[in-house]
């Protein structure tokens, strides 16, 4: 489904994820805004990122930080206006960059007009827009529900929080005894699908380059193997190919063998699902810790399986993090982060850098939940731009800030690191440039793991592109390692940490070395 129609710009895309409310505040209300993003596009471009993933910016009651949408076609006033967002599109494109919006197709806010109409007892256009049972006494099995708040007799399924009613895309295997379980081709589910296409059409026509799709694998119910949801996305892919063939699609699915067949260009390996992503950075003994007690072996095995199943189709992406994960710096120090970024920025697929990870922003401990963040709130604190008032994020009083800043006196900031060639940000910038300068390291370059990083050992992989071959040696553990797999006579292109290479390669602990051979 994704071959010659893949947008060419994905071949060398490096994404920067922006959580808008925490990025840059230009009107002193303590909340980041679209004009603040426009103001900082130069910073993103100077880092080397050429694409943006913008988290939800649509009208919302913000019970889940914007992942509870009240109006898909209106920008939330706290961020600005639709015109501001279109201006952001223009400014991004003027720099030769691209931008994806965050699309939440599985549920809405309870304040959405669709849900208000759906709650009415009298049948109407939106009666079947959500998954409702036929009786308030019957709960949708395996899903939470909303009930007792409507004139309508029934319980409405929810997807995540209890205020996020599930939109009705149908059931792949409806239970004949439960008439409320509508098949995918019933009138209600098809109308929901068309409404989703209308939303996509609206923003693509306005200048968006595509979408990152929230919970993309969860739309069709009673769909254990995902085949119904795959078919739904194939239909949407066909619509995009007809009307917006350049639109890029990335899924939050975590199973590339399904999402890429479904028509997405990219999927993530994430903190949920079968990827073992957490083994690398976010567990009791992460592989990228210098303690050397972690292992990348199960991650490598899962990655190999995904590669085999997708057979070269689409891109498999490994993000530095996102708004739902602990910050990388919660488990890794600066030197460990350097080696982690050397891995992240030399793997196939498009890299995604979560705002602030490039400077080693920390998880802020002990925060009270903000807008449904709960344990995720500490990863959503304001971007630290400089050493000025509120770290340069906002001129508002500290108590007005959306989320409190990292209170540490030594918190990292972008300005200081941009002036320091030895900083983490400078390393990340060099690594992005290294990636872009070498065809073998591009998103679609060839990939073969030579070792699997078992038991804290070095991870070795070979990247190929055109006539170029690069061997990557990633050795996070604090002990040296001999790497017999690297051919003699090669040329070291980039290194973090020490090494000797006189016919055989030996790397120091906490190192990353890249050899062209």
Pin down the residues of each PLM region.
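Acidic/aromatic-lined carbohydrate-recognition and catalytic surfaces
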Residues: 2-191, 205, 216-264, 383, ...
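Loop/helix patches that line or flank the sugar-binding groove of alpha-linked glycan CAZymes
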Residues: 10-11, 243, 255, 260-263, ...
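Aromatic/hydrophobic pocket-lining residues that form the small-molecule binding cavity
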Residues: 37, 85, 196, 229, ...
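Beta-sheet entry/capping signal
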Residues: 50-51, 96-98, 200, 209-212, ...
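Conserved alpha/beta catalytic core and glycan-binding cleft of carbohydrate-active enzymes
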Residues: 110-146, 233, 237-382, 387
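Active-site groove signature of glycoside hydrolases
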Residues: 199-222, 318-325
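Beta-strand-rich binding/interaction modules
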Residues: 479-497
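C-terminal beta-strand-rich structural cap/linker in extracellular carbohydrate-active enzymes
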Residues: 501-517
């Amino acid at each position: 489904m994704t071959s010659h129609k893949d947008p060419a710009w994905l071949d060398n895309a490096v994404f920067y994820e922006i959580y808008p409310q925490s990025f840059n505040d230009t009107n002193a209300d303590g909340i980041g805004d679209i004009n603040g993003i426009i103001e900082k596009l130069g910073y993103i471009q100077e880092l080397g990122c050429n694409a943006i993933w913008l988290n939800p910016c649509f009208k919302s009651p913000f019970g889940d930080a914007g992942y509870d949408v009240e109006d898909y076609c209106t920008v939330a006033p706290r961020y600005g206006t639709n015109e501001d967002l279109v201006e952001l599109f223009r400014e991004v494109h003027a720099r030769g960059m691209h931008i994806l919006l965050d699309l939440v197709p599985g549920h809405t806010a309870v304040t959405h007009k669709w849900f208000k109409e759906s709650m009415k007892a009298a049948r109407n256009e939106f009666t079947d827009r959500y998954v409702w049972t036929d009786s308030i006494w019957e709960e949708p099995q395996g899903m939470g529900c909303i009930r007792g708040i409507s004139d309508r007799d029934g319980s409405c399924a929810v997807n995540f929080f209890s205020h996020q009613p599930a939109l009705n895309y149908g059931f792949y295997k409806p239970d004949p005894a439960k008439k409320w379980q509508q098949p995918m081709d019933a009138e209600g589910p098809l109308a929901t699908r068309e409404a989703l296409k209308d939303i996509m059409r609206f923003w693509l026509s306005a200048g968006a380059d595509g979408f990152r799709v929230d919970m993309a694998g969860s739309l069709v119910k009673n769909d254990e193997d995902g085949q119904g949801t795959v078919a739904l996305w194939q239909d949407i892919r066909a619509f995009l190919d007809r009307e917006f063939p350049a639109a890029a699609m990335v899924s939050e699915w975590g199973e590339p063998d399904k999402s890429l067949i479904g028509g997405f260009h990219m999927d993530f390996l994430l903190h949920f699902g079968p990827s073992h992503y957490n083994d690398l950075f976010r567990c009791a003994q992460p592989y990228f810790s210098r303690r050397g007690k972690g292992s990348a072996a199960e991650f490598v095995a899962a990655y190999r399986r995904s590669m085999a199943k997708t057979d070269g189709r689409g891109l498999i992406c490994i993000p530095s993090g996102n708004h739902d994960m602990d910050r990388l710096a919660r488990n890794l120090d600066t030197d460990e982060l350097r080696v982690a970024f050397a891995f992240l920025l030399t793997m196939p697929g498009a890299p995604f850098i979560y705002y602030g990870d490039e400077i080693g922003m920390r998880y802020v401990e002990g925060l009270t939940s903000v807008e449904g963040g709960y344990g995720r709130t500490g990863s959503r604190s304001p971007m630290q731009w400089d050493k000025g008032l509120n770290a340069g994020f906002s001129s508002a009083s500290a108590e007005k800030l959306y989320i409190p800043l990292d209170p540490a006196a030594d918190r990292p900031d972008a300005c200081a690191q941009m002036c320091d060639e030895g900083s983490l940000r400078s390393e990340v910038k060099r690594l992005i440039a290294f990636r872009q300068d070498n065809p073998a390291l591009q998103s679609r370059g060839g990939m073969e793991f030579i070792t699997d990083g078992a038991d804290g050992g070095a991870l070795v992989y070979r990247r190929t592109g055109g006539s170029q071959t690069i061997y990557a040696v990633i050795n996070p553990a604090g002990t040296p390692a001999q790497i017999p797999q690297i051919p003699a006579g090669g040329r070291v292109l980039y290194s973090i940490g020490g090494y000797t290479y006189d016919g055989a390669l030996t790397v120091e602990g906490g190192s990353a070395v890249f050899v062209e051979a």
